[in-house]
């Protein structure tokens, strides 16, 4: 499970990442933008959006809705970090939803690999090493439970 320090770091970082709805939409678009910049092949999972770029995530209702949905899911994980069974249940639900869309554990690993850089950008350089390692651990739980 996650340590007390990791749980606190997740909660503290979430206050920055998801301060309000506008911030959540902006940060989710930035997160996916970085993923697609580093790993263009991951765009194949998003047939709703233009295959060449992901500006549509910020510009369209569908894009904003997906970003908000992803960040709401992350928020549920952060809100549940003190309940290990709930975190595992959420991880398994997320896995089922993504497996149905052809998203693999390797795709989750790619997201995990860019998350520290995303945190730096989204927090304006205020992400601590504790925050980065806590998110890495939480994303590790998602990967371990991806079937």
Curated annotation (Swiss-Prot):
Xref: PROSITE patterns: GLOBIN
Keyword set includes Signal: no
Protein keywords: Heme, Iron, Metal-binding, Muscle protein, Oxygen transport, Transport
Q: Which SUPFAM superfamilies match?
A: Globin-like (SSF46458)
* UniProt cross-references to Pfam families, sorted A to Z: Globin (PF00042)
GO cellular-component terms in the record? extracellular region; hemoglobin complex
The record ties this protein, via InterPro entries, to: Erythrocruorin, Globin, Globin-like_sf, Globin/Proto, Mb-like_M
Give the matching CDD domains: Mb-like
According to the UniProt entry, its GO molecular function terms are:
heme binding; metal ion binding; oxygen binding; oxygen carrier activity
Which residues belong to any copy of the Globin domain?
A: 1-147
Q: Which residues are involved in binding heme b?
A: 66, 98
Tell me which family the UniProt entry assigns to this protein. Belongs to the globin family.
The note filed under miscellaneous reads: In contrast to the other dimeric myoglobins, N.mutabilis myoglobin is a highly cooperative oxygen binding molecule.
Q: Subunit comment for this entry?
A: Homodimer.
In terms of PANTHER family, this protein maps to: GLOBIN-LIKE PROTEIN
Record-given protein name: Globin
Q: Which organism is it from?
A: Tritia mutabilis (Sea snail)
